[in-house]
Amino acid sequence: MSGSTGERSFADIITSIRYWVIHSITIPSLFIAGWLFVSTGLAYDVFGSPRPNEYFTESRQGIPLITGRFDPLAQLDEFSRSF
């Protein structure tokens, strides 16, 4: 037996003025906030990833590849000491 749950249909929601008033403000605000988060470099600081100019320093020019199958921890320690 099917019945109504009392919820508005999706078509009703997206055709209402209230929906578009709310979302015409929130969607661009989220886009601008994300753009500022990345462009100011705060994303690098929050997630701890190196900035593009910090991947290769003067003291560390090689690519940190792990080549040993049986001693990866020793290689990781060596890479982390070079930071």
UniProtKB/Swiss-Prot annotation:
Coiled-coil positions: none
Entry GO MF terms: electron transfer activity; heme binding; iron ion binding
UniProt GO cellular component terms: chloroplast thylakoid membrane; photosystem II reaction center
Family annotation (SUPFAM superfamilies): Cytochrome b559 subunits (SSF161045)
The protein's required cofactors: heme b
Domain of life: Eukaryota
One of the protein's GO biological processes: photosynthetic electron transport chain
Intracellular or extracellular location(s): Plastid, Chloroplast thylakoid membrane
Record key words, sorted: Chloroplast, Electron transport, Heme, Iron, Membrane, Metal-binding, Photosynthesis, Photosystem II, Plastid, Thylakoid, Transmembrane, Transmembrane helix, Transport
Annotated TM spans: 21-35
UniProt: heme binding residues: 23
Bound cofactor: record note: With its partner (PsbF) binds heme. PSII binds additional chlorophylls, carotenoids and specific lipids.
PROSITE patterns: CYTOCHROME_B559 (PS00537)
Keyword Membrane: yes
Presence of keyword Hydrolase: no
Topological relation to the membrane, as annotated: Single-pass membrane protein
Matching InterPro entries: PSII_cyt_b559_asu, PSII_cyt_b559_asu_sf, PSII_cyt_b559_CS, PSII_cyt_b559_N, PSII_cytb559_asu_lum
Subunit structure: Heterodimer of an alpha subunit and a beta subunit. PSII is composed of 1 copy each of membrane proteins PsbA, PsbB, PsbC, PsbD, PsbE, PsbF, PsbH, PsbI, PsbJ, PsbK, PsbL, PsbM, PsbT, PsbX, PsbY, PsbZ, Psb30/Ycf12, at least 3 peripheral proteins of the oxygen-evolving complex and a large number of cofactors. It forms dimeric complexes.
Role description: This b-type cytochrome is tightly associated with the reaction center of photosystem II (PSII). PSII is a light-driven water:plastoquinone oxidoreductase that uses light energy to abstract electrons from H(2)O, generating O(2) and a proton gradient subsequently used for ATP formation. It consists of a core antenna complex that captures photons, and an electron transfer chain that converts photonic excitation into a charge separation.
PANTHER family reported for this sequence: CYTOCHROME B559 SUBUNIT BETA-RELATED
Family: Belongs to the PsbE/PsbF family.
Protein name, as recorded: Cytochrome b559 subunit alpha
Organism expressing this protein natively: Liriodendron tulipifera (Tuliptree)
Gene (name only): psbE
